[in-house]
Curated annotation (Swiss-Prot):
One of its GO terms (biological process) is methionine biosynthetic process. Residues 1-17 have a biased composition (Polar residues). This is Homoserine O-acetyltransferase. Substrate binds at residues 255, 383. Its EC number is 2.3.1.31. SUPFAM superfamilies: alpha/beta-Hydrolases. Belongs to the AB hydrolase superfamily. MetX family. Residues 1-39 are annotated as: Disordered. Its main location: cytoplasm. It catalyses: L-homoserine + acetyl-CoA = O-acetyl-L-homoserine + CoA. GO terms for molecular function: homoserine O-acetyltransferase activity.
Length: 402
């Protein structure tokens, strides 16, 4: 795969060229979020009204940005909800262009004749609550005329699914033919099946755990700290700052940390080894190792399309994830799932290891593969679910045939 022609979130690790480095010359914006003055692109918008959070806080109005593919049947019984990962958005299919800084993140999975066949299914992909690509989040304008920023309510996975349920109501969809999600989207998909079992016919949970772990929270805490300790973060009030004067260094550092967990040990070692970038020694001569250049490039690129407050909001939502946190416990929560379920793990995933998917599958009443997950072999680690179209697509075809 030529990673230069694919979405930034689906790119296998590779060397960075001088041309790519030059493409990021210039100061990054204070926030890389989509703005109302930007082109709409393929987005549509659905208002869901006032919204109450688990924390007890509320917003007077919430809007969901989304994109769709395929045609909704007259009976409204062919709708598929696809949920994106932490830094994804509604643009699952399509080229980069006005309104969309990256190309679609699941183009090999969604489309005519593909695993999620848009000749048969109506596919809806919303940007999650708290995101920064059109759905209400920290970059949205509060009633006082300023961005919500750090004032945005603490958001949980359950809050995000509640907003998605209201979004489904706005579309007139009472029951999804399938809910599909990977990574953070997989957390939401699982929460859908637990919280709204009567509204989910099929379920795919890909590379996601039943709850966050201490190890995952620890990695996340360092990323949160990188942003909060950036001297240009200003407690989350940076939206009026000039280009180059926002918390881009902290956000880029958080992204670099995250990328390490998204890739496998073997992929990074095999691709980069101890190679120098541009032939300049990193051993005292001011150069960088190639893997450092890769992380720097993608960290800096990320600041052009994401927002620091939104990143904090969404990472903390991931930390909140626990499908049994209502007091019933994990086993009781998962026993409520009635959907025909596909649970997929990736053998090289070091962000959400396979033991999490094993825990999910062991308590599900109607999993396709019984009490064990389907584990795919991939060189790419956690991001294999975004890269391995044939492997992941083949499993999704099984689910949609069920």
């Amino acid at each position: 795969m030529d990673w230069q022609t694919t979405s930034a979130d689906t790119a296998p690790s590779s060397f960075i060229t001088e041309e790519q480095d030059r493409s990021l010359f210039g100061k990054p914006p204070a926030s890389g979020a989509w703005k109302e003055s930007d082109p709409v692109g393929g987005r549509r918008f659905a208002g869901i009204g006032a919204f109450g959070f688990e924390s007890g806080e509320s917003l007077p109005f919430v809007r969901i940005a989304y994109e769709t593919w395929g045609e909704l049947s007259p009976a409204r019984d062919n709708a598929v909800l696809v949920l994106h990962a932490l830094t994804g958005d509604s643009h699952a299919v399509g080229a980069a262009g006005p309104g969309h800084r990256t190309s679609g993140w699941w183009q090999g999975i969604i489309g005519p004749g593909k695993a999620i066949d848009t000749d048969r299914w109506f596919v809806a992909v919303p940007n999650m609550l708290g995101g920064c690509q059109g759905t209400t989040g920290p970059t949205s304008i509060a009633p006082d005329g300023a961005e919500w920023g750090a004032r945005f309510p603490f958001t949980t996975i359950r809050d995000q699914v509640k907003a998605q349920a209201a979004f489904a109501d706005a579309l007139g969809i009472g029951r999804w033919a399938a809910v599909v999600g990977g990574s953070m989207g997989g957390m939401q998909a699982l929460e859908w099946a637990v919280g709204f079992p009567e509204r989910v016919e099929r379920l795919a949970v890909i590379a996601a755990p039943p709850h966050s772990t201490a190890d995952q929270i620890a990695f996340n805490s360092v990323q949160l700290g990188a942003i909060r300790t950036d001297p240009l973060f200003h407690g989350g009030s940076y939206y009026d700052e000039k280009d180059g004067e926002g918390p881009h260094q902290g956000l880029a550092l958080a992204r670099r940390m995250a990328l390490i967990t998204y890739r496998s040990l073997s992929e990074l070692n095999d691709r980069f080894e101890r190679t120098w970038q541009s032939g300049i020694s990193p051993l005292g001569d001011g150069g960088r190792f190639a893997v450092e250049s890769y992380l720097d490039f993608h960290g800096n690129k990320f600041t052009r399309r994401f927002d620091a407050n939104s990143y904090l909001t969404l990472v903390q939502a991931m930390n909140s994830h626990d499908v049994g946190h209502d007091g019933s416990g994990l086993a009781a929560a998962l026993s409520r799932v009635t959907a025909t379920t596909l649970v997929v793990g990736i053998d090289s995933d070091r962000l959400f290891p396979v033991d999490g998917q094993e825990l999910i599958a062991s308590h599900l009443p109607a999993a396709l593969d019984g009490r064990v997950p389907l584990v795919v072999r991939s060189h790419f680690g956690h991001d294999g679910f975004l890269i391995e179209d044939d492997l992941i697509g083949g499993q999704l075809r099984r689910l949609f045939a069920a």
